[in-house]
Swiss-Prot record:
<comment type="similarity">
    <text>Belongs to the herpesviridae DNA primase family.</text>
</comment>
<feature type="site" description="Essential for primase activity">
    <location>
        <position position="536"/>
    </location>
</feature>
<comment type="subunit">
    <text>Associates with the helicase and the primase-associated factor to form the helicase-primase factor.</text>
</comment>
<keyword id="KW-0862">Zinc</keyword>
<keyword id="KW-0479">Metal-binding</keyword>
<comment type="function">
    <text>Essential component of the helicase/primase complex. Unwinds the DNA at the replication forks and generates single-stranded DNA for both leading and lagging strand synthesis. The primase initiates primer synthesis and thereby produces large amount of short RNA primers on the lagging strand that the polymerase elongates using dNTPs.</text>
</comment>
<keyword id="KW-0863">Zinc-finger</keyword>
<dbReference type="GO" id="GO:0006260">
    <property type="term" value="P:DNA replication"/>
</dbReference>
<protein>
    <recommendedName>
        <fullName>DNA primase</fullName>
        <ecNumber>2.7.7.-</ecNumber>
    </recommendedName>
</protein>
<feature type="zinc finger region" description="CHC2-type">
    <location>
        <begin position="894"/>
        <end position="932"/>
    </location>
</feature>
<dbReference type="GO" id="GO:0003899">
    <property type="term" value="F:DNA-directed RNA polymerase activity"/>
</dbReference>
<dbReference type="GO" id="GO:0008270">
    <property type="term" value="F:zinc ion binding"/>
</dbReference>
<keyword id="KW-0808">Transferase</keyword>
<keyword id="KW-0235">DNA replication</keyword>
<dbReference type="GO" id="GO:0042025">
    <property type="term" value="C:host cell nucleus"/>
</dbReference>
<dbReference type="InterPro" id="IPR033685">
    <property type="entry name" value="HSV_PRIM"/>
</dbReference>
<dbReference type="GO" id="GO:0039686">
    <property type="term" value="P:bidirectional double-stranded viral DNA replication"/>
</dbReference>
Length: 962
């Protein structure tokens, strides 16, 4: 076989298999052979096919290469299969270069019989043995089995014999090897519709297959291969190629069939694929690097991955990449694409800033600080921090909500003539209004004295000398009840002395229970002088004691490093700055079980004891929007039976791990090898981390404190001395609850326990060797009066610290996709004022709930009646989303699962505008059962509110029962 070979894809007007068999058996069928496409192997042929017209024909006749005629394969793995081999005769060359039909006589004259039947002899022998049942003899007459095989006729004579005697079976065998369903339209539709892809994609896909990409990808790659070629001299158009004669002439005369455009096409495709993979590799490398170093919550990391791809491969970036790899000179190499570099500059450089706390704060956080004169600062501290916390005996009151409501109402009536604004009567009379007492208590406790002898606080407590402001506490009672307390001072030694008390049953008496379980209520009207972090670690496995101690030292270091950046004018030595760490006591028997290596006790079916309501963290997923700090009336209005601990959900018991969180906090130390067993916390571990705001600063506003907590969590995630020892033990990296920093939310204080059906347990105790002052209430209350003078007030923490990825994604949606109608405008078109709280609540209860009720009736049998007559109370309002809690005459049962003891589920609805610019209402629930995620918010379904806003005009569009 000649070293230079041309492979030809041919077609016939009739059945190509029958036509080919007739040629192979020496017959001369009617009709002609048409060259559809061809490719060559051998460097010498590149020169021949680069010559124009007649010179190319002369060069091919001089070189006399072999020509293999092929048909398409019947299976995808074999795209073309050879049928016969011929010499490059003048007729064959004209068929290649001009697209002229090749007569059967010309094919027979050019056919190389030996080379041709070398392709088919194996098939001919196999067919002969099967069809004529040739078998070697056995037994006494046995002889060499290869002898009858030698006697089988092969070549043209053998094929002719088979074709004559077994025509049907022979045709069937060849049709299993070769495809025979191709028409001119099939080629144009599959490889066209334009000339370049019809010629080049056919050649490259069939003769130069690549397993890495398919035909669609090949055609896309050729879109940027644009060599200059002359117009097709055939004068034909791809849409008019209705016969193989026209198709052959069009393809063989095309400028893409010969010359530099054809010679360099395969090389260009390979280089283009390498260029694309190189740019994709840059993206993969960045993501792989960040996967190990960028500690993000799972949901946020998924957002990051999608966002990285969008930033790298959005329309603008892809257009730049395609312009860079586009070529007009076939011999030119593929250009260098800026895709990876632009992605690094536009996106990943900002991500890298998330990996260094100094860069993170510098690029993403913009603090706003007000400077006060010393006298003004002293007045600010006097009006905005607790006047007193310590006293020889408790000075104040503690009672259930109903009793306090009557007392507050009486006090407001006494103060009304002096300008006090009373709560509206209808607010006090609506269902669940007893909870509004908390908001009213916060107002009375924070009302400044203004130099008057009688104050609102004094009137409330019956203590004329009581100086405001005063702390407000929530007290957990037995059987999921609660009480509230307002104290102008307390004997804190009584509380801290109980640190070693054994677990006990919860009491019903508020005054006694106040020293067992107490939660400080956040008052957004007061200044924050202690940063108190509610830290909950969800564990993949128990943490060894030494590892935990080392990790918490890293935690403290990260917090102080970040605060040093956020408060650059702070006085004092950061290495000596106090940072108090308190840990929730382990479950009873947990430490023994851990030491013995036994598994923790199995939970109940629904986990009601394991996962009680965590009301102070229940809406952490929702956050709080500016201007919505006044929804404490809703928070406290929920019956106390749904209240329990606010922070960690750790379990029951006493005890804690040792450590030294205060020693050498800012000096890196190696993680000590520790053989001590882990503590008894096996699934969750709760901490309270408290550090005073440094002199001369104070912090104002719930949003500011919430922002500080987010920045501090990011700082902890970037601290190697925390993440390296602790990372393998954590299920996720969201452990600082920022939802507690909202007006009316409460957080359990150190030295106090949580309460549920199992009694009082999980007391927050000092972790390790606590620094001096760990038992001083001025060091773990949000609004305690500082010992230093205040001349700087941090009142805003702007920037992108909240969520770099979410904000970036929001900008991309605004830049690349259609803008949605603002929710306020959508509601305004329905004659509803989004700023009018009562009108909005009435709209939800009377109109928007209609599709929700119909969907409940259709898909949740027996549940719709629970929602009949339900009212809606606004919880959170954001520009594009408003959340309401539903309040019904009865409890709402869980819609996600059936529970043995029918636990109540907190139910919400949210108004928003979807991607199709439709007003939608979504129903979601929080169920405290373990199988439902232990208070995790789950959307049950979403329905569209019809534009007519009538109960008949609203229709449900989608649902998911989870």
């Amino acid at each position: 076989m000649p070293p230079s070979m041309i492979r030809v894809l041919y077609a016939t007007d009739g059945c190509a298999i029958t036509y080919s068999l007739m040629l192979l058996t020496g017959q001369e069928p009617s009709g002609a052979v048409y060259v559809v496409s061809y490719a060559w192997d051998g460097a010498g042929l590149d020169e021949a096919f680069s010559l124009p017209g007649e010179r190319a024909e002369a060069e091919l006749l001089a070189r006399r290469p072999g020509v293999t005629f092929c048909l398409t394969g019947h299976v995808a793995s074999v795209r073309v299969r050879p049928v016969f081999v011929a010499a490059a005769t003048p007729a064959v060359v004209r068929a290649l270069c001009r697209g002229e039909p090749l007569a059967a006589r010309d094919v027979l004259e050019a056919m190389d019989e030996a080379a041709t039947f070398a392709l088919h002899d194996g098939l001919i022998a196999a067919l002969t043995m099967v069809l004529e049942q040739v078998r070697p003899r056995t037994g006494n007459a046995e002889y060499a089995p290869e002898r009858p095989l030698r006697s089988i006729a092969v070549g043209r004579r053998g094929l002719t014999s088979l074709f004559v005697h077994h025509e049907t079976q022979t045709l069937a065998a060849f049709r299993r090897l070769y495809g025979n369903h191709n028409t001119p339209f099939w080629y144009v539709a599959r490889f066209g519709p334009e000339e370049k892809t019809l010629v080049l994609a056919t050649r490259l896909h069939l003769f130069h297959p690549r397993p890495a990409y398919d035909l669609r990808a090949l055609k896309d790659l050729l879109l940027t291969y644009n060599p200059r070629v002359d117009p097709n001299p055939s004068g034909l158009d791809p849409a008019g190629l209705l016969s193989f004669a026209a198709l052959s002439r069009f393809c063989c005369l095309s400028g893409y069939a010969r010359g530099p455009a054809a010679a360099h096409a395969a090389r260009y495709v390979d280089e283009r694929v390498r260029a694309d993979r190189a740019e994709m590799g840059v993206l993969r490398d960045y993501i792989s690097h960040d996967r190990g170093s960028l500690k993000l919550p799972d949901r946020e990391f998924v957002t990051y991955v999608y966002l990285a791809h969008f930033e790298s491969f959005n329309r603008a970036r892809l257009r730049e990449h395609l312009d860079a790899v586009n070529v007009t000179d076939p011999a030119a190499p593929v250009g260098r694409s800026p895709l990876g570099e632009r992605a690094a500059a536009a996106f990943f450089r900002h991500v890298r800033a998330q990996l260094n706390i100094r860069d993170y704060v510098a690029q993403n956080v913009t603090p706003s600080v007000a400077r006060l004169a010393p006298a003004m600062g002293a007045g600010y501290v006097e009006d905005r921090t607790y006047a007193a916390l310590a006293a020889d005996a408790p000075r104040g009151l503690c009672d259930a909500a109903a009793g306090l409501a009557r007392r507050v109402t009486a006090v407001e009536e006494r103060l009304a003539p002096h300008g006090w604004v009373r709560a509206p009567d209808e607010e006090q009379q609506q269902p669940g209004a007893d909870g509004a007492v908390l908001r009213r208590l916060l107002e009375l406790a924070a009302a400044p004295g203004g130099g008057r002898a009688r104050t609102a606080l004094g009137a409330l407590l019956g203590l004329p000398d009581a100086c405001p402001p005063a702390p407000v506490y929530r007290v957990e009672l037995a059987h999921r009840r609660q009480a509230f307390a307002v104290l102008a001072g307390d004997a804190w030694g009584r509380a801290t002395a109980r640190r070693d008390a054994a677990p006990e049953m919860a009491a019903h008496e508020p005054a006694a229970q106040m020293y067992v379980s107490r939660h400080e209520v956040f008052n957004a009207r007061l200044a924050v002088t202690n940063i108190v972090l509610d830290v909950d670690f969800r564990l993949a496995r128990p943490v060894p004691a030494g590892t935990l101690e080392a990790a918490m030292r890293g935690f403290r270091r990260a917090v102080l490093d970040a605060l040093a950046l956020l408060f650059p004018e702070a006085d004092g030595d950061w290495a000596a700055h106090p940072c108090y760490v308190y840990k929730s006591a382990c479950p009873p028997g947990g430490a023994l079980a851990a030491a013995a290596g036994s598994a923790s006790a199995a939970s109940s079916d629904d986990g009601l004891e394991e996962a009680p309501w965590d009301d102070d963290a229940a809406l952490a997923d929702f956050g709080a929007a500016p201007g919505d700090e006044d929804w404490a009336d809703w928070d406290a209005g929920v019956p106390a039976e749904v209240y329990t601990c606010d922070d960690d959900e750790v379990g029951v018991g006493i005890g804690g791990a040792g450590g030294d969180p205060g020693a050498s906090a800012l000096v890196r130390a190696p993680v000590p090898a520790d053989e001590r067993p882990p503590c008894g916390c096996r699934a969750k571990m709760g901490f309270r981390v408290c550090t005073p705001v440094p002199s001369p600063y104070a912090v104002a506003g719930a949003d500011t404190v919430r922002g500080l907590a987010r920045v501090l969590q990011q700082a902890v995630l970037l601290e190697r001395d925390f993440i390296e020892p602790m990372g393998p033990y954590l299920q996720d990296f969201t452990f600082v609850d920022t939802g507690v920093y909202a007006h009316g939310r409460s957080l359990r204080l150190p030295f106090f326990a949580k309460v549920d059906g199992g009694g009082c347990h999980g007391r927050l105790l000092p972790f390790g060797d606590a620094p001096p002052g760990f038992d001083d209430p001025r060091n773990f209350h949000f609004h305690a009066r500082p010992a230093h003078a205040v001349t700087r007030v941090l009142h805003s923490l702007g920037g992108e610290y909240e969520s770099f990825f979410e904000r970036k994604a929001a900008r991309n949606r605004e830049a690349f996709f259609a803008r949605r109608t603002p929710l306020a405008d959508m509601l305004r078109g329905l004659a509803v004022d989004a700023e009018d709280r009562r009108a909005l609540e009435a709209f939800v209860a009377d109109v928007a709930m209609a599709p929700v009720l119909r969907h409940l009736d259709a898909h949740f049998n027996g549940r719709a009646h629970e929602y009949a007559g339900a009212t809606a109370q606004r919880v959170v309002a954001k520009p594009d989303w408003v959340l309401f809690q539903l309040c019904g005459s009865a409890r709402f049962s869980c819609l996600r699962a059936r529970h043995a003891r029918s636990p109540p589920a907190r139910t919400f609805v949210a108004l928003s505008v979807d991607a199709h610019d439709r007003l939608c209402i979504s129903l979601s629930q929080q169920c405290f059962a373990t199988k439902c995620g232990s208070n995790a918010t789950r959307t049950i379904f979403t329905a569209e509110v019809g534009q007519s806003c009538s109960s008949a005009g609203a229709r449900c569009t989608s649902s998911s029962s989870g």
